[in-house]
Amino acid sequence: MRTYVEDESDPGLISKKFWKYLKSTSGGTRVPETVNYGSRFRNNPLGQSELFNEFFCDQFSAASTYDIDIDFSNDTDFDIDFNFRKIRKLLKLVNPNKAAGPDEIHGRILKNCAVSLAYPLSVIFRTSYNSGMIPKDWKIANVVPVHKKGSKMSVENYRPISLTSLIMKIFEKIIRDELMWRCENQLFNNQHGFLPNKSCTTQLLSFTDSIATALNASTRTDIVYFDFAKAFDSVNHDIILRKLKERFKIDGTLLKFMVNYLQHREQCVVVAGQKSSSASVRSGVPQGSILGPLLFVLFIDDMSEVVSEGTKIALYADDTKIWRKINVWEDHEILQQDINALHKWSIDNKMKFHPKKCKVVPVSPPDKALQDLFNKIFPLRNIYFYNLGGVQLEFVKEEKDLGVIVTSKLSWEEQVEALLSKASSRLGLLKRTMHFLKCQKQRRAFYLAIVRSQFEHCVQVWRPSSDSVNQKIERIQRRAVKWILSEQDHSYNDLEYLMRLRDLDLLPLKERFITSDLLLFYDIYHNCSCVKLPPYIKPLTADERRRLRPKINRNKNIPDNECLSFHKLRESRNDPMSLKCEIEPKSKAFKSNFFFRTVQEWNCLPSEIKEAATKSNFREKLLEHVKLKVFKTVAMESNDS
């Protein structure tokens, strides 16, 4: 096992072979010995691959005609440069360990032969694009079933991931960049999936800020989560081609190419090396391709047009939610009208929702005694039941939203507890299975990749402000440090712990989270992010900065960073980049909101850090500042000794 883990080139590193093994044993791509589709069961790889292929084909929508008028009169507008230098650069970026597609041309060959292959490929790409004819082998996919959730025995709980030709992926990257350049400015801002500078974090930040602001004003918000049935596989080719032409003004050679890209595709499913028979792909965009995700985003974009003013919508690929402030009873009815409009959109676009999987989360301020009494006397009087296509939607207290648990109180206790449980479990697994490792560098790498990474996803959204919760999270890292240093029997005081963190080049997790907040806030402040500063965050005027007075924290419920101390006061008075929040925080949800808490941290930064010209320069200065602040006590102790 030791030789399997260690990298031959550097024993301090962990071999790629081991990471691949770890991924394969995590269950994402493993198929159990027996799978079923309805009442049919298969227990051999070939039979399983056929069963998976049948299920995936059953999800296709009606076949398309591909009958669309193409206008070549302005075709020079759609000319694409297939420069061999650009292709050579893309070839050199190919991951040599990437799985080969059906053509069995491996990434290592493309990377190592980039100089020789660049020019002939540029000729092939240009000829293929101009003629609107893609080689047949480039439109064949080996499909790998990847488990989503639910029983692993049921093929219905898997999604198809397509392994296509690596050469075709390079071709697609060039086309995708052109398509993105033409369409990006026409997309609604509320789509955050598969787009540059957008992510789960950017989507959830704007969403949670809207909910927290409403809670702070004692206003209820109803959130409706939608679940598409096999969204990527259901995209009708005629509809997406029509939208490309009419909505995004794609025409001529580029549209002709897209028609051929979607036409006559074939797939076979691979399970344990056994291939199913080939099947025609009647609809959908291939998951695992380069163009597929962008085509889906373009297909679903006009969904945003159907909701009412005052109702907000957010998308991450097919993950869709709408929400609305509920001030009066009519707001329920308007939200129901929006649900109806989205249902009609799905029918018109030949997509399907899973009504049983669509949920409603009502986010309300703390109940008042009088309201509680009223609910006991008239339990159904003030409840509006939403429905989707005649099916009543279920009300739930929490819903996992892009990997983050959103609750009816907009509190993050459930999210933190889930992460603590998972991180603790993974750390325990490391201790049991990697006990033979003696190298600190390897142990540290395992901790970062398998344990600490659990706290990285969307941390700017859910970061706890409570010291007690931060201490719970830090205990995980304390245990990890003992394991990394083989000091399980030791008990550290705070100073000893900080000394070990410094030696391992680690930060306390609270400071790491704050650093993540500030790095994102830098982008937002400098308009380098799709997220914008909310209207209640304003610059401090010169007069306001002069009138600043230090605050002494007499309230233990208010974190220290919300109180402006004397040394921070001097910085803020002279700093034109200081900001203020014009909303008085009344709710716990708003106090822990990203924008409110991060403004306090931002104002406390020295002006020379905030004025950094680039993101990399800001990161460098910020980390230096944070480390100096965190390890100041350690440095003083070392000097004394």
What do the predicted segments below correspond to?
Residues 1-84, 374-387, 525-583:
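Basic/polar low-complexity segments
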Residues 38-39, 469-641:
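Short linear motifs embedded in intrinsically disordered, charge-biased segments
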Residues 56, 77-286:
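Conserved pre-catalytic core of RNA-dependent polymerases
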Residues 101, 140-143, 159, 191-193, ...:
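Catalytic palm active-site di-aspartate
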Residues 111, 230-248, 321-344, 464:
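Catalytic palm subdomain of template-directed nucleic-acid polymerases
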Residues 175-191, 216, 293-323:
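Active-site palm subdomain of RNA-directed nucleic acid polymerases
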Residues 337, 352-397:
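Short, conserved micro-motifs composed of acidic
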Residues 390-460:
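Basic, alpha-helical interaction scaffolds
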